[in-house]
């Protein structure tokens, strides 16, 4: 039986990170095109798209998502709050332990075939996986001494990493086991942004 992916796309129209000096997006950046890319690359045979829309900054009826199905409306106003609500939504769905939950923010491009690549990763001895190899691991001096183990699957190679930008996947059974950790590092955030790095360091301590 092939694993099923439940994608939880968290969609909003304001991010405090976007105002940081190193986060300026190019003029051609467009969340509508990002969404179209996701819809065109998702494989409906193995993946189901769920949208979590934060109406704090405006009603969904004013957006390109107004006619989409499988939408959960929340009202949080910050990333950590929306992540906590998404965790609660997932907890209430009754997914099987083998269901792959993919937390996705609204500004990631995907390549063709990403669903099968993501499922490939769960043949490795890992609990969580991200499709995003963040640039900070290569340019941030804080990672100068980072050592990563390399894993190989049929399609690509992977590395272990201490952070994911809160866009990552895991089996539902693993999320149930670690739910208190996932919740804590959002609930305890001092600035409304989940403490992703600290979370994955803590998860690493638990194996």
Task: Enumerate the language-model features and the residues they cover.
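A short, conserved alpha-helix in the catalytic core of glycosyltransferases
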Residues: 174-177, 186-207
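Conserved donor sugar-nucleotide recognition element shared by glycan-biosynthetic enzymes
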Residues: 79-83
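N-terminal anchoring/stem segment of glycosyltransferases
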Residues: 2-78, 89-95
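Short beta-strand-to-loop acidic/aromatic patch adjacent to the donor-nucleotide binding site
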Residues: 97-109
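A short acidic (Asp/Glu
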Residues: 18-20, 60-65, 85-86, 112-116, ...
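Well-ordered, non-membrane alpha-helical segments in soluble/globular domains
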Residues: 24-38, 114-117, 191-202
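Conserved catalytic core of nucleotide-sugar-dependent glycosyltransferases
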Residues: 109-183
């Amino acid at each position: 039986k092939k694993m099923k992916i439940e994608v939880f796309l968290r969609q909003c129209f304001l991010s405090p990170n976007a105002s940081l000096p190193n986060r300026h997006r190019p003029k051609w950046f467009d969340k509508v095109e990002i969404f179209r890319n996701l819809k065109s690359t998702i494989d409906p045979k193995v993946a189901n798209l769920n949208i979590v829309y934060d109406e704090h900054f405006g009603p969904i009826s004013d957006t390109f998502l107004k006619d989409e199905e499988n939408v959960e409306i929340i009202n949080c106003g910050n990333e950590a709050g929306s992540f906590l609500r998404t965790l609660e939504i997932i907890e209430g769905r009754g997914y099987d332990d083998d269901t792959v939950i993919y937390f996705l923010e609204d500004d990631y491009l995907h390549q063709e075939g990403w669903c099968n690549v993501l499922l490939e990763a769960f043949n490795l001895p890992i609990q969580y996986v991200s499709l995003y190899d963040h640039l900070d691991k290569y340019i941030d001096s804080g990672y100068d001494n980072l050592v990563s183990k390399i894993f190989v699957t049929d399609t690509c190679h992977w590395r272990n990493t201490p952070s994911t930008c809160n866009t990552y996947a895991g089996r539902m059974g693993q999320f149930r086991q670690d739910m208190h950790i996932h919740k804590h590092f959002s609930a305890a955030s001092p600035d409304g942004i989940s403490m992703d790095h600290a979370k994955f360091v803590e998860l690493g301590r638990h194996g």
